[in-house]
């Protein structure tokens, strides 16, 4: 799954809320908050600088804590799917269930049935709406793994019917 401008479009209020929900508090949270409160930027073209303008969205580029802060933010997707009781694939019978893979701004949902995948997509849509994240549908793909053979027309039709509502 591909998010449209994931690093550049995160609202700071949602970012700080996610950091706080992950248990960051005290002086460290205050430091992060101060980095994003009334963040100002300007544009340099050749040797000229624009006027400063407020930037209410995006993680700070080049900041050493930005990848960690973004990871805390994107982890909200996994937590939401877990909290809604969605199911993934069993790795160890009855012990380990895997339903989402996260790496930076890349997300892979894992399900054993098309219906299960649709349920995860529905949950993810609710969470993305809440976090104000936009999925790039044109860059998002479905991949099916199965034991042998090609997908039947029926199975292929089911996979094509999956929708980002």
Where are these predicted regions, by residue range?
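Nucleotidyl polymerases of mobile genetic elements and RNA viruses
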Residues: 1-165
